[in-house]
Amino acid sequence: METIFALSSGAPPAAIGVIRISGTEARGALEALAGSVPDARKAALRRLRDGEGKTLDDALVLWLPGPDNATGEDCVELHCHGGRAVIAAIERTLGTMPGLRRAEPGEFTRRAFANGRIDLAEAEGLADLLFAETELQRQVLQASAGGRLSELVGGWRERVLALSAQVESALDFSDEDDVDELAPAFYTDVSTLADELGEWLERPQVERLRDGVRVVFAGPPNAGKSTLFNALLQSEAAIVSPIAGTTRDVLERPVAFGGTPFTLIDTAGLHEGGDDSIERIGIDRARAALRDADIVLWLGPEGEGPDNAWEIDAQSDIDERTAKSAPRLRLSAKTGEGIDALVRDLRDAARDLLPRPGDVAVNARQHALLSEAAGELAEITRGQDLLITAEHLRTARSAFDRFTGRATTEDMLDALFGRFCIGK
């Protein structure tokens, strides 16, 4: 396998740039650059030179022999000055060395997976953690990247193995005419594990956390949707005009309130009729956004919004109007009245829609595998042929193996590690 290298720190210019090298030629590359290799896992100052002996930079270098490191292979880290020219010169020199090449996106992490340093669930958690933008996302995804989810699944797998051992024992000590019954405790254990998996299947998934709670602003034209949208974003993201129908498309913006992620969605004004084909497309898109919404803020006439929509009286600063009799909130985007209360209510509602801080969450792929395992356990019944019971347990165990990557496909791995940046 070729030795790979890449810049693992932020894009230059920066105070420090960290270049990683991983593979069998890592030690030789360090020796060629620095003239000597320092003691393992001890930082040392070295002058780096190119193949002609010209100085590239003075850097702190680390020699990290495998397998007890990030990738499980021999590794080197070069902590150099973070200027563009310095980084480019060092990478250019590395590229001329036999057996070395630039790393592909996610290739360091993929090698860590291949060498057993992390499992698939940890890799998926790390991929999501790299794109975490809010505190809640960081807390939940850190738990998955740190191995808590893998420990949990490993425990479930061990329980299935123990159940399989009981079935195999019963098969070994039975004859063709008199198959021994499994103990009642066996079925209790199966039911308990199935219920535990079922509880996990009810929890919010990572995708919901990644995208945030979808909040749609809906109502007729000129109801104040875009004004409220801008007020919550604290920016002029949407055009606001007294002309009805100014907003003709769906406008989405991510935002975090107190570390909780949301996606705010402004929509075209809803009304019947109209000969403008572009406006009709905007209305159709608005209705589609309503179908996918977690929360709808209804700024139209009271009682005319979708079921479970929040009735918002968004023009509390205007005297000549027909006020809603029982709105959830009265507010004014112009004066700021009620905006803080709306944000508090949104955050409170999000607690039931998103994983809680410190929780472990699964993604759609992992959810499907847990569902498969739970379904197999649910098929196990008293009096069932023991060979059928054994097959249900084997399939459940296979689902757990695919969860952590004991069994997987190259296409799925390509898709996962392709999400990483170069150098990770």
Swiss-Prot record:
Record's GO cellular component terms: cytoplasm
Binding sites annotated in the UniProt record for (6S)-5-formyl-5,6,7,8-tetrahydrofolate: 20, 77, 117, 424
Amino-acid positions noted as binding GTP in the UniProt annotation, renumbered to this chain: 222-227, 241-247, 266-269
Binding locations of Mg(2+): 226, 247
Keyword match Ribosomal protein: no
Cofactors: K(+)
Cofactor note: Binds 1 potassium ion per subunit.
Disulfide bonds: none
GO MF assignments: GTP binding; GTPase activity; metal ion binding
EC identifiers of the protein: 3.6.-.-
A single GO BP: tRNA wobble uridine modification
Alphabetized PROSITE patterns for the sequence: G_TRME
Subcellular location: Cytoplasm
Family: Belongs to the TRAFAC class TrmE-Era-EngA-EngB-Septin-like GTPase superfamily. TrmE GTPase family.
Summary of subunit composition and partner proteins: Homodimer. Heterotetramer of two MnmE and two MnmG subunits.
Name of this chain's protein: tRNA modification GTPase MnmE
Species name: Erythrobacter litoralis (strain HTCC2594)
